[in-house]
C-alpha cells in the first residue's frame, strides 16, 4: 500500500515506514503530523485517485528531525573584469517517518 500526498508544493510517494525529507514544518521533534492533501492511494488492485484530493484520506507521520541540507553554491562571473560574486545556500528541511495511511 502506498500513497501520494502533497506538502510544501511538492508531491511525495510514500508507504508505511518510509522516512521522507519535506520542506520545513514548524513542529517539534517527536510530534505527530497529519497530511490531508492525499492525491492517490493504491492498495493492491484497489486504486483511489482524487479530484484533486481523496476525501477522508490522510497520511500520518512522526517528526524525526529538523535540519539543513547540503550547501548549494551560486557563482556569478563576469569575464575580463576581475568581477565575480559567490553565494551559498542551505535549505531547511523536516524529516518525517510515515506511521500510517488511512483511506
From Swiss-Prot:
GO annotation, cellular component aspect: cytoplasm; ribonucleoprotein complex; ribosome
Matching entries from PROSITE patterns are given as: RIBOSOMAL_L21
Q: Which UniProt keywords apply?
A: Ribonucleoprotein, Ribosomal protein, RNA-binding, rRNA-binding
Q: Which SUPFAM superfamilies match?
A: L21p-like (SSF141091)
Q: Which InterPro entries match?
A: bL21-like, bL21-like_sf, Ribosomal_bL21, Ribosomal_bL21_CS
GO molecular function annotations of the record = rRNA binding; structural constituent of ribosome
Q: Which GO terms describe its biological process?
A: translation
Say which domain of life the source belongs to.
Bacteria
Q: Which Pfam families match?
A: Ribosomal_L21p (PF00829)
- Name the NCBIfam families for this protein: L21
What does this protein do, in the record's words? This protein binds to 23S rRNA in the presence of protein L20.
| Family note | Belongs to the bacterial ribosomal protein bL21 family.
Q: How does it assemble?
A: Part of the 50S ribosomal subunit. Contacts protein L20.
PANTHER family from the xrefs? 50S RIBOSOMAL PROTEIN L21 (PTHR21349), LARGE RIBOSOMAL SUBUNIT PROTEIN BL21M (PTHR21349:SF0)
| Name used for this protein in its record | Large ribosomal subunit protein bL21
Q: Please tell me the species this chain comes from.
A: Histophilus somni (strain 2336) (Haemophilus somnus)
Q: What is the lineage of its organism?
A: Bacteria, Pseudomonadati, Pseudomonadota, Gammaproteobacteria, Pasteurellales
Give the gene symbol. rplU
